[in-house]
Amino acid sequence: MEKKMTRRSWMKSSLTTLASLTAVSSLPTSLKGSIMPAKLLAGESSSSSSKVLMTKNISSDALVKIYEALGRKASGRVAVKISTGEPGGHNFLQPSLIKDLVQKVDGTIVECNTAYAGKRFTTEDHIQAAKDHGFFDIAKVDIMDSEGEFKLPVKDKKHLQYNLVGTHLKNYDFMINLAHFKGHAMGGFGGVLKNQSIGVASSKGKAYIHTA
């Protein structure tokens, strides 16, 4: 299905949760104590800072509650962006943790192939990796660049003119971003912004970003 998508409409339809959460002004009474607004750092103004919800309870129930506390319902065709994780490793969100939320929103787990040779470089291998890690047991899984990519324009063109994203991104109306914090040997870290930028880039798109 062809559907026109701009950078603005894509970002507006995306919901960031777990790793970085935009809070509603007040929490339901049932959630107080288990989920709390993050504290401001010294010198920060509440009027200029984003509100973030945090919880020490890392469980499927808490994940659903924090989603509900946002006050914005996922609607239409919902994509749930995760990292499927490298085969043989454990650095990915466990299906048991995200299952309740994914099924609550009737979401499809989405990913794109990697830019480097490995067990997630081809769609066939990537699907097998997702199966091995248990994601097919909880929801449908879509490798979004399995049928190519399209150019998504970017606003700041200092380094990039566009992002090459998986063509199946056009099939969704709403995206929930489930990212886990991960350190990288080259002095950086992966989180929500990476998961929703280079994470939805096709294999070619990832190479394009890395060489910009």
Located regions from the model:
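N-terminal and secondary-structure boundary signal
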Residues: E2-A212
